[in-house]
Amino acid sequence: AWSIPVKGVRFYEALFEKKTLSKMGWVSTPVTIETTDSLYLAIHEANLTDYAAMNLKPVEQVEDNKTVTLRAALTPWSTGEKVRVTDTRVSPWRTMIVAESAGDLLLSRLMLNLNEPCRITDTSWIQPMRYIGIWWTYHMKHNTWHAGPHHGATTENTMRHIDFAAANNLGGVLVEGWNEDWATWKFSFTKPYTDFDIQRITDYGRSKGVALIGHHETGGNVSNYENQMEDGFKFYEKYGVHQVKTGYVGDLLDGKEYHSSQFGVLHYRKVIEAAARHRICIDNHEPVIPTGLQRTFPNLMTQEGVRGQEWDAWDVDGGNPPSHTVILPFTRGLAGPMDFTPVTFRFVNDVMPQTRVHTTLAKQLALFVVLYSPLQMASDEIENYEANPEPFNFIVSCPTDWSRTVVPEACIGSYVTIARCDKGEGCWYIGSITGDEERTANISLSFLDTDKRYLATIYRDAPEADYETCPAAILIEEREVTYSDTLTIRQARSGGTAVRLCPIKDS
């Protein structure tokens, strides 16, 4: 079974551990299980509303038949109660996906369908997006969130990012560090720093067709945020900001409550509903684990709740290992859209040499497809994209929401290949990634239309590519293919392949 522990882990940001059920401790869900008779199970919950999140504990083992009993363990309030109820209450659904292959787990819509139908009448303002941001530069220590000589969120720097986004068909620019007061973490959500002219920025962005993506870091101070939340959303609505990333960095909410407690669940729901009233989409960081609420409130576009790419910038243990991203689709990915923030083109951090990105460049491109998020960030500093325009062309063209998904091959912890079809042009995009070992991917194209020819643009590891010794080595090639073809491609250690397949129009 693959799971992450509850104790000692903040915001679900941990590496998934592979253990037998009998050796598994108190863990968060989803828990993914491979049985001895080659079935795949995933235990989670759906429609978590005004309740505490479910964790699992093994409580009994019968040695004779190797039976292990798992029991639900709810995240408590600081006072010890699990759930506070004054009237009747409907508990969340307890879910189990049962699949005959690892890939079939990824195609289940069970959790989503157990949530209530959409409550937003007009959803035309809710749109998927590729975006960049003033963010990775902080992790590289090139800029600061707080005001000063190296402040990142300035008018000029934001406009420079808007220019890059406009030139590369990217929909938005996330700006963190725009508001007072990052020096003390007593945040205002309506007062920009003096060097951040939001009127000028949003006017400029509109002229270029690029949105400003807002940011509300709360530091876990829920009371301060709820006192300002309506004004903060009104402020953004006034300037035409329709996407906001929220953050809750801090071990506890209001200094005492767990993020996944009933207190946290109620707060996050309040934020999502308030945002919807102001036509604002939410990217929720440090969340309670997703359970399908995006069906009811589709303005909940994506959430973190994962040990993402940022850990490669500063983790004292060295960063995410190669196997991490070939486990995530079968675990955290089953809970819903995941803001992992991929597409890092520079693999080291000069000020923290003990850590690095443990992938090849081709794998970074493939992650844009493999890890689903309708709001999908290309996280690196734009200078690194400007230095590598040809690989970045894959990101420029790649959608972030899809009409169909297939999984040609998958083995949890070793490799996964996911193909997704766009919602208009009939183009397919493939992301194929591997873990610790070099391998040869055999990607059947049988999902393509049988009566069409396709131009395949393939971004793959060069022969010398290796995530440790030569991560940036990449080859880009084109070939004509049909549904009867199979792509046979070598992948380096922690390598990958990204493919764009577009129908060839007869002249």
What residue ranges belong to the model's regions?
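N-terminal accessory beta-strand-rich subdomains and adjacent acidic, glycine-rich linkers
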Residues: A1-R119
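An acidic-aromatic substrate-binding cleft motif
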Residues: T86-N168, G172
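Solvent-exposed beta-strand/loop surfaces of large extracellular or lumenal domains
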Residues: K7, I458-S484
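C-terminal beta-strand-rich structural cap/linker in extracellular carbohydrate-active enzymes
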Residues: E478-S507
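Conserved, mostly hydrophobic/aromatic
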Residues: A165, I282, V370, I430, ...
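Carbohydrate-binding surface patches
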Residues: I412-Y454, T497-R500
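Aromatic- and carboxylate-enriched substrate-binding clefts and catalytic-loop regions
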Residues: E176-T360
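Catalytic cores of secreted or luminal carbohydrate-active enzymes
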Residues: A362-P408
